[in-house]
Amino acid sequence: MTTHVAPQAKDWYQAKDSDTGYQKVIGYMPAAHGLTLAQNDIIQMVKVGIGTIITDVILLTGAMGSSVTADVGDVTNGESIYISAADVSGNSITYMESVDLVGVPFTYTVADTIDVHFEAATPASDQAFSLIVGYITGVDITP
């Protein structure tokens, strides 16, 4: 298992600074970035700041390979998983609205990334996938 970082998740990348908006990583193809994916690889896709609430998550994929599934969220520590075990073996669109899988909005208390985790089989590195994340920022998290 390897963790890869998409350009939008790197330290130097500045996310939109409005109170609400969408962060998009469109047409990310691992092979175009010199990557060969393996089963259980994680790709950090979008940076999120302190006080961010995620409102929507959309994952679009090409045919990632037989039996491949994907999780989307903070997959390294499991605090917020927005899409779980989505079948991405063929072309797919998976959408999550408003809340993570535990049923309540998750507010980030530290800066983090939203990741895509390919499971169950080795995903195709020559297939593009896109992640669109809707968010609200500037939420006051002080008690």
At which residue positions do the language-model features occur?
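Surface-exposed, low-hydrophobicity beta-strand/loop segments enriched in small/polar/acidic residues
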Residues: 2-143
